[in-house]
Amino acid sequence: MRRLVYILSVIILLCAGCSRQQKAPVKIPLTSAHRGASTIAPENTMASVDSCIKYGVGNMECDVCISKDSVFYVLHDSTLDRTTNGTGDISDWMSADIDTLDAGSWFAPEFAGQRVLRFADLLQRAKEGGLRIAIDYRNGGLQEMLSLIKSKDMLENCNFTFSKEEDIKRFRELAPEVKTLQAYIRSESDIERVVREVNPDIAVVWIDSLNPQFVEKCRKHGLQVLALVLGTDDKTADNQKAVDLGVDIIATDRPVQFIMKYGKATP
């Protein structure tokens, strides 16, 4: 009888050990808020930034535009029409006039008075709140933008995406020490070409294109993987897919909801 109990005990311990080995810690990706926490506050406003910081979102994606008098602003569209009470291209406006615009009322009455966010103010608040910034560069003033980022001591806390090859080359010349250059990769077969031509640090890939082989190939080329899971509709399945694939960053329009379900990024 004792021998039987002993054998059963050993079997139970072995099974428990196997179970522990199978349940490896799940890697939670860094959450990147597309245009800020844009489902609970107007996109690219300070209210949206503050919501990211409040809920522990690790990264905020933004587009940087430039005014007529060379002041940098955070705005997704090139025009002011959709998200402010102004009209026309932001590049045709002086900063003093841009600063008077309402960038919150379109979203909800309680956000009336939110302003078009100056990029310098975003950098300062991000620095204070421990928020990384992912910059989608448009055009104009690259050297000046980098100088502004350096003046805020935020260069190591920014990721950069460029759409033009000449901008990428210029960026590498101006900031060779930065290791957070992002590049879009549309398919697994495109990895070698992008690595050869752009030499990025982070692969930006739509979630529909990702699979284990894609991720593994990126890793072999020394790339981190950012999964694009954009849209305000239900992304439950896509979010889970990104987590299961072990991506490094997930870009989402619902960052707070992702954090509430999965928690903050695994160190």
Where are these regions (language model features)?
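Bacterial Sec-dependent N-terminal signal peptides
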Residues: 1-26
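Phosphate-group recognition and catalysis centered on beta-loop-alpha active-site segments
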Residues: 17-267
